[in-house]
Amino acid sequence: MAKKSLIAKQKKHQKFAVREYTRCVRCGRPHAVNRKFGVCRLCFRDLAYAGAIPGIKKASW
């Protein structure tokens, strides 16, 4: 889990757009965040396995 201070710092409006970055809305992780769903790869996997994301299922071929 991310520190609350880092999450609050990220939410503030940055002076330069290049300084803004995405964080997972579920756990606060700053890396490997999927822009479409707003969650990191770990949370995405958990939500997909639980069936919480419609239309997403494990690939099998």
Curated annotation (Swiss-Prot):
InterPro entries: Ribosomal_uS14, Ribosomal_uS14_bact, Ribosomal_uS14_CS, Ribosomal_uS14_sf. Its cofactor is Zn(2+). Transmembrane segments: none annotated. One of its GO terms (biological process) is translation. Part of the 30S ribosomal subunit. Contacts proteins S3 and S10. Binds 16S rRNA, required for the assembly of 30S particles and may also be responsible for determining the conformation of the 16S rRNA at the A site. This is Small ribosomal subunit protein uS14. The lineage of its organism: Bacteria, Bacillati, Mycoplasmatota, Mycoplasmoidales, Mycoplasmoidaceae. The gene is rpsZ.
